[in-house]
């Protein structure tokens, strides 16, 4: 075959094809989540400059808040304390870039604020679509996050559990 080293027809026995510089210390979650958070923050910063109907702006703003909340939740779920980023970062933002991580409770409270905004403002646009985000998807995501965080708080933090369980939409 063309590249026998790439299939199981020829086993590589030496380390010549191994480059230690290419091995990641993590699976890339940290970078990927903050990349999506950055995109959401850029959208939120510049969407008012775009000429489009108010309903569409509201929808895309809600979508950005939903994504930002979800990505912060993914970081908290995997790493615990993390940085809350709610603006487009520059090199001048040293306190965020090199500062201490924020407590998971603080971050999750802000995640809940983002999710509440998304649920309140997403509307029924695309409600009949099976491929587009709508208020029902936002509620389902909010439910999943609140139930996870409530359960985590009950068994690990011994606080805040009731708050998240009460905020979870009960019909999802």
Task: Show the residue positions of the predicted features.
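Conserved, well-structured interaction surfaces
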Residues: 3-79, 95-109, 113-130
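Acidic, serine/threonine/proline-rich low-complexity intrinsically disordered regions
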Residues: 88-89, 140, 153-166
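TPR/Sel1-like alpha-solenoid repeat signature
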Residues: 65, 139-145
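Short, flexible, mixed-charge acidic loops at enzyme active sites
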Residues: 81-90
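Amphipathic alpha-helical protein-interaction segments enriched in hydrophobic
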Residues: 131-141
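Short coil/turn linking the two alpha-helices of tandem helical-hairpin repeats
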Residues: 76-77, 83, 126, 148-157
